[in-house]
Amino acid sequence: MKMLKSLSLIPRIVSPFQKCYSTDLISLVGVPRVKISKGQNRYLLVNIHTHGFTKYGRVIVRGADVDNHLAIFDSILEELEPEGICAKILGGGRILNEPDNKKIKIYGTSRTFGGADHTRTRNILQAWTTYKDFKITVKQ
């Protein structure tokens, strides 16, 4: 009888671990690290994490041809909030993406969110398979 009582506690013990290590953190892995458009774009460097797990974050790059960096942030929130993922802006700037010439230039700052670490942005882009062969220049 004691054995059955002990076994009944297993779901309560396993449930928190299952949630922490499967659903929430796996949803971070499903978020693409890079989404930028062709041509001249504004971009944001963003640290994303599951709500309550700020220690286990991931840095992503988002860029689009919009009027201001706030529009990019709004689209990031629309994409991530339904998944329970929080976003913290690390800074912004501009990206000139020339896929035909395999060149990318990263420069400038965001008036709204401040300057991003362009070297970190370059490293993320170079790690992404699409931009691995591109010549990426950084202007601080």
UniProtKB/Swiss-Prot annotation:
UniProt cross-references to InterPro entries, sorted A to Z: Janus (IPR007702), Janus_sf (IPR038596)
Key words, A-Z: Differentiation, Sexual differentiation
Gene: janB
Entry-linked PANTHER family: BCDNA.GH02250-RELATED, JANUS-A/JANUS-B
Family matches, as Gene3D superfamilies: Janus/Ocnus (3.50.20.20)
Upper taxonomic lineage: Eukaryota, Metazoa, Ecdysozoa, Arthropoda, Hexapoda
Similarity remark: Belongs to the janus family.
Coiled coil location: none
Disulfide bonds: none
Binding site for substrate: R42, S110, R111, T112
Top-level taxonomic group: Eukaryota
Biological processes per GO annotation: cell differentiation; sex differentiation
Protein name from the UniProt record: Sex-regulated protein janus-B
GO annotation, cellular component aspect: cytosol
